[in-house]
Amino acid sequence: MVRNNSTSIVDRYQSELLQPQKEIVKRLRAFIARRYPELTESLKWHVPIYSLNGKNLLGLQDFTAHVNLNFFRGAQLHDPRRILIGKGKYVRHVTFRSVADIDCSALKGFIDQAIQPI
């Protein structure tokens, strides 16, 4: 993952979260950084956003009791197990209430699709 000043800002964002959101965000960020080094991490709209070639692909959003991983083109992703949540025109998300909810193999499939050209 491209490491820059934005990543330091995201580190600060993460440090201010409460548990379990802090640990969920930490694990998701580590997975994305390790598996998708080509993505750029930044803080936009007060949440971590991942982009490729200037196009926003993913976002982490914390809530009181969970964290969502948003896929900005989620409606276009192949999801036969119906893991993705949402009914809007474009965005879909996966909700994590604990680190035990993180299924890296399913996420890999969605992120692999998301980074493909439209």
Enumerate the language-model features and the residues they cover.
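Charge-dense, helix-prone N-terminal extensions
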Residues: 1-118
